[in-house]
Design a protein with these regions (language model features):
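Short, charge/polar-rich alpha-helical segments
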Residues: 3-17, 23-45
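Amphipathic alpha-helical binding modules
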Residues: 74-133
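Short intrinsically disordered terminal tails
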Residues: 1-6, 129-133
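Charged, low-complexity interaction regions
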Residues: 29-39, 56-69, 96-100
Length: 133
């Protein structure tokens, strides 16, 4: 299966690379050199990378494999959202706005926001990956 960025952009709540860059820049600016925030960010990157691996392999799986792995994927996705929330909560406690978290949206407001949060997690894994060369 060949997937393209253009196809992705046609999906509900798709986030452009430019928007993801902006959100990431806002996030990094608020984290700054705060040791605890950096630790939370590292934990987020670890789970985002794990989730991105699962998600990137998803189109390659047959129906039985998807059924077998679906609960694990959902659990990992839930953990990604929890880690975003933990980082945002901590930053707010430090007097930051964490407006980037609101920009990603909340599942309670629109179920597609869950997918957008997963998309952004994949973006973070992508950025980490290309910087690892």
């Amino acid at each position: 299966m060949v997937c393209t960025y253009e196809e992705y952009l046609k999906r509900p709540k798709a986030i452009t690379f430019a928007k993801m860059q902006t959100i990431h820049t806002e996030m990094i600016a608020e984290i700054g050199t705060d040791v605890d925030a950096l630790e939370l960010y590292d934990e987020l990157i670890k789970i985002a990378t794990r989730y991105a691996t699962i998600r990137a392999n998803w189109p390659l799986l047959n129906r039985d494999e998807k059924n077998e792995q679906d609960s694990g994927r959902t659990s990992c996705h839930n953990s990604v959202i929890t880690h975003f929330n933990m980082l945002a909560r901590y930053l707010k406690q430090q007097g930051k706005t964490a407006a980037w978290r609101d920009e990603l949206g909340y599942e309670e407001d629109d179920p597609y926001n869950r997918k957008a949060i997963g998309d952004f997690a994949c973006y973070l894994a992508f950025v980490n990956g290309i910087n690892a060369r």
